[in-house]
Amino acid sequence: MSPVSSAAAADGATGAHAMLAAMRNAGLNPDDVQYLNAHGTSTPLGDANETAAVKAAFGDHAGRLAVNSTKSMHGHLLGAAGGVEALITVLAIHHQVSPPTINLVNPDPACDLDYVPNAAREMRIEAAMSNSFGFGGTNGTLAFRRLR
């Protein structure tokens, strides 16, 4: 483990791996994805690590993604969090709206992506992903596409 790892937070490599695997399995390239529902538990270490993972997985496209954490609205639902966030991601595609990350006033400088602060955003969403990250780097990412 790296110095920034612990039993509760891996260093971000496993999160990047989960996102890359989801894109590969779905036949998506990073620039095909417009929206990411991040795990985003609002912890300094976890959010910085997830930001680093998003940058590693999406490269230059990371700065063009709409990234949010809907946990800012519904809280951490433990085992149900991944399912609820996957449903929210599908609804974002259906309605073509990225939900906001509410109460984002003073973001950590290490968290420098477009987190859709405080207000929903109408946008084109053809493909989206949802992260569900667990203790010690037990991570899952689902990828979804708009039906054509």
What are these regions (language model features)?
Residues 1-148:
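Conserved "HGTGT" condensation-loop signature of ketosynthase/thiolase-family condensing enzymes
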